Structures are given as structure tokens and as C-alpha cells.
Curated annotation (Swiss-Prot):
Pfam families: Ribosomal_L28. The keyword DNA-binding does not apply. This is Large ribosomal subunit protein bL28. The lineage of its organism: Bacteria, Bacillati, Cyanobacteriota, Cyanophyceae, Synechococcales. Gene3D superfamilies: Ribosomal protein L28/L24. The keyword Nucleotide-binding does not apply.
């Protein structure tokens, strides 16, 4: 499974690791992904998703149904 948020499609970022002498080498900044069981009110059940912590924060404000509709995700498949 790809390291990608299932709601926002957030993925890893290319960056540089900069040493003390300012030499730059490429590195990857991974997304902070967490497995979460979230209560889906419309479906009357829990849904298990792999979400970024940014998506979790947004989820508290918008709700799982609204975010899934924006992302075009059918929660019945999870």
C-alpha cells in the first residue's frame, strides 16, 4: 500500500538534507499517517482509514461524510 492519505491524497515530499558544511543531499519527507477507526454517521458503522494528521484535524471540523464527498470516495468500500 502506498504511503498516501486516503482522504486528501497527501504524499511524501522531495527535500534536501543540509549538513553543517551546507552540502545538500536529497531526502524524502514522509507524511505522518495514522490508521484510524472513525464513526461514519450516515452508514451507522466504523470506517478504518489511513489518514494524515492534517486530515484528522480537518475531519474534526468538516466531518467524514463531507470530506469523503469532496475526495470522491465511497465509504461503503472501507
Amino acid at each position: 500500500m502506498a504511503r498516501r492519505c486516503q482522504l486528501t491524497n497527501k504524499k511524501r515530499n522531495n527535500a534536501f538534507a543540509i549538513s553543517h558544511s551546507h552540502r545538500r543531499t536529497k531526502r524524502l519527507q514522509e507524511v505522518n499517517l495514522q490508521w484510524k477507526r472513525i464513526w461514519w454517521e450516515e452508514g451507522k458503522r466504523f470506517v478504518r482509514l489511513r489518514l494524515s494528521t492534517k486530515a484528522l484535524k480537518t475531519l474534526k471540523a468538516k466531518g467524514i461524510g463531507a470530506m469523503a464527498r469532496e475526495a470522491g470516495i465511497d465509504l461503503n468500500q472501507f
